[in-house]
């Protein structure tokens, strides 16, 4: 899970949306 958040901070300045996606992963 940490990797997901870290990726958000590295790839997205506003990790707000990214973090939400991390909490609610979308099925492929």
Swiss-Prot record:
Contains 2 disulfide bonds. This is Potassium channel toxin kappa-KTx 2.9. Negative results: does not inhibit voltage-gated potassium channels Shaker B, Shab, Kv1.1/KCNA1 and Kv1.4/KCNA4. The keyword Secreted applies. Belongs to the short scorpion toxin superfamily. Potassium channel inhibitor family. Gamma-KTx 2 subfamily. It comes from Pandinus imperator. Keywords: Disulfide bond, Ion channel impairing toxin, Potassium channel impairing toxin, Secreted, Toxin, Voltage-gated potassium channel impairing toxin. One of its GO terms (molecular function) is potassium channel regulator activity. It comes from the Eukaryota. Disulfide bonds join 4-22, 8-18. One of its GO terms (biological process) is negative regulation of voltage-gated potassium channel activity. It is found in: Secreted. Reversibly blocks voltage-gated potassium channels Kv1.2/KCNA2 and Kv1.3/KCNA3. Coiled coil: none annotated. Expressed by the venom gland. One of its GO terms (cellular component) is extracellular region.
């Amino acid at each position: 899970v940490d990797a997901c958040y870290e990726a958000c901070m590295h790839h997205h300045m506003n990790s707000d949306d990214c973090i939400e996606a991390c909490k609610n992963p979308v099925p492929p």
